[in-house]
Amino acid sequence: MEKIDSLDKKILEIITHNARIPFKEVAAECGVSRAAIHQRVQRLADIGVITGSGYHVNPASLGYNTCTYVGITLERGSMYKHVVKEFENIPEIVECHFTTGPYTMIIKLYARDNAHLMELLNNRLQEIEGVIATETLISLNQSIKKEVPIGLSDEDKAAIEALMARKNALVTDNADD
């Protein structure tokens, strides 16, 4: 993966807190042009650092009131790809992970209520060839949801401050003219 610099990290730090922030504001905060921000964001997307942008829908607002994690044990780990293909046909499943530990995989799904959850478990998940056991954990409350830390180092912060100081000096010099 291509290296990202301190400006890239600053941009990421800003846009991960507010994906709708205008590039003009990001540019002002970073001390560079709007075009530079646009080019940087596009490059970060092209190299796979930024993997998407969009709106997040509150599942409860659509009637999905039960957030559930299900640990799944497969007959054989080699059945993982087959099971994932089956899971892709179940719209309530929003995440799937191949794991170490007591389960072969863990999925996250949303159900309307406990009856809907039971229907999904008994009539959909446990009917898939290769699934031999499930263990269900219902989330009572999501306490934290955030992105991974961008990790601006002291060196990165100093570089950004230097950029800002240089920009401010240019603005001041031009104002005096």
Locations of regions flagged by a protein language model:
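A compositional/biophysical signature of low hydrophobicity enriched in polar/charged and small residues
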Residues: 1-177
